[in-house]
Amino acid sequence: MMAAGPRASLLLAFALLCLPWTQEVGAFPAMSLSGLFANAVLRAQHLHQLAADTFKEFERTYIPEGQRYSIQNTQVAFCFSETIPAPTGKNEAQQKSDLELLRISLLLIQSWLGPLQFLSRVFTNSLVFGTSDRVYEKLKDLEEGILALMRELEDGTPRAGQILKQTYDKFDTNMRSDDALLKNYGLLSCFRKDLHKTETYLRVMKCRRFGEASCAF
């Protein structure tokens, strides 16, 4: 039987994932800043895990083990997010302000909305890929949460962003083509990396704002 503590934590996490970012006026009090951060972190963690699982399943199914390392060091695995001033780890993220990290996170999330909108049409023969039809909705939800955080930190008046919007190519539906397999492999690798960055940024912001004891990650 699961202990009361872990079970309560899981129930709280599930409840937070089910919460909308904003409430109707007069229905419930608006979500606190700490609640917005907690919700965003949970959603980013969930998406990052889903991206990692999908990448591993694709790799196991389609990419021979002997070719994986060499492919990941080619242009196929190059991510456009590497061309923007995005921190590559927790220490670098600590040097950025919360709004800078939120703007970078928003850019990363928005760059995947187009490619992921039809992801389920590409991957249809796997239990992992079977969840892909909801990835777009989950990503839109995280985008909404990041925008809500930006509104809170900017006193409800978001400033015009200075970041160049860019998007990844769409996934290739021709899974019988080697070129398509390599392209999709590279895209899934980038998606996993970008979600890891987004999760890291949100956790850094949450930890330094609220001084939690469990900030080590």
From Swiss-Prot:
- Reading the lineage from the top rank, the first entry is Eukaryota
Q: Which residues carry this modification: Phosphoserine?
A: S132
UniProt entry keywords in alphabetical sequence:
Disulfide bond, Hormone, Metal-binding, Phosphoprotein, Secreted, Signal, Zinc
Leader peptide range in chain numbering: 1-27
A molecular-function term among this protein's GO annotations: growth factor activity
GO terms, biological process:
animal organ development; growth hormone receptor signaling pathway; insulin secretion; positive regulation of growth; positive regulation of receptor signaling pathway via JAK-STAT; response to nutrient levels
Where are the bilayer-spanning segments?
none
One Pfam family from the UniProt entry? Hormone_1
Q: Where in the cell is it found?
A: Secreted
GO annotations of cellular component type = extracellular space
- Binding locations of Zn(2+): H46, E199
Q: What is its main location?
A: secreted
What are the disulfide bonds? Answer: C79-C190, C207-C215
**Function as written in the Swiss-Prot or TrEMBL entry:** Plays an important role in growth control. Its major role in stimulating body growth is to stimulate the liver and other tissues to secrete IGF1. It stimulates both the differentiation and proliferation of myoblasts. It also stimulates amino acid uptake and protein synthesis in muscle and other tissues.
Family classification: Belongs to the somatotropin/prolactin family.
The name of this protein is Somatotropin
Q: Which organism is it from?
A: Cervus elaphus
